[in-house]
């Protein structure tokens, strides 16, 4: 099993949790981004640099991931594609995206996008809280325990 990270928008504190977990459990961790990333020197961690452009990292992840791989992303359309490919998608806040909740999340995203197009200010996500960081770490540990 591999953990893929949509790394451009992933918070540093979440990447740090992922680095420690990958090293501790000997789990492959692949960061995909369109900018250079720094990460610990480990045989289990690597970075893929994709061209700058719309959804380049997303396309790389979905074309290289395998069923049952874990993808860390806040990108709802990417999460939906991961689910279609039989992978597991988790947000940096520890929320698991599933076949049962992804349609609702896509609908909400589309509504917010329509509001933004009409000039409404919908705001972005709030800063990651300590509780959400813990929630992510716990969800990751559960996945690792199940899949190692």
Curated annotation (Swiss-Prot):
CDD domains in UniProt: PIN_YqxD-like (cd18720)
Domain of life: Bacteria
Pfam families in the cross-refs: DUF188 (PF02639)
Membership in a protein family: Belongs to the UPF0178 family.
PANTHER family per the UniProt record, alphabetical: UPF0178 PROTEIN YAII
Listed name of the protein: UPF0178 protein lpl0088
Organism: Legionella pneumophila (strain Lens)
Phylogenetic placement of the source organism: Bacteria, Pseudomonadati, Pseudomonadota, Gammaproteobacteria, Legionellales
């Amino acid at each position: 099993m591999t953990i893929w990270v949509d790394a451009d928008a992933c918070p540093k504190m979440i990447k740090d949790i992922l680095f420690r977990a990958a090293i501790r459990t000997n789990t492959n961790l692949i960061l995909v981004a369109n900018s250079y990333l720094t990460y610990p020197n480990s045989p289990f961690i690597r970075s893929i640099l994709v061209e700058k452009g719309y959804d380049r990292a997303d396309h790389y992840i979905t074309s290289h991931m395998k069923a049952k791989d874990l993808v860390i992303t806040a990108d709802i359309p990417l999460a939906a594609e991961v689910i279609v490919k039989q992978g597991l998608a988790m947000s940096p806040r520890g929320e698991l995206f599933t076949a049962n909740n992804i349609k609702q999340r896509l609908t909400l995203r589309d509504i917010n996008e329509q509001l933004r197009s009409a000039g409404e200010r919908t705001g972005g996500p709030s800063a990651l809280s300590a509780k959400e960081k813990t929630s992510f770490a716990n969800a990751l540990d559960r996945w690792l325990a199940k899949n190692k």
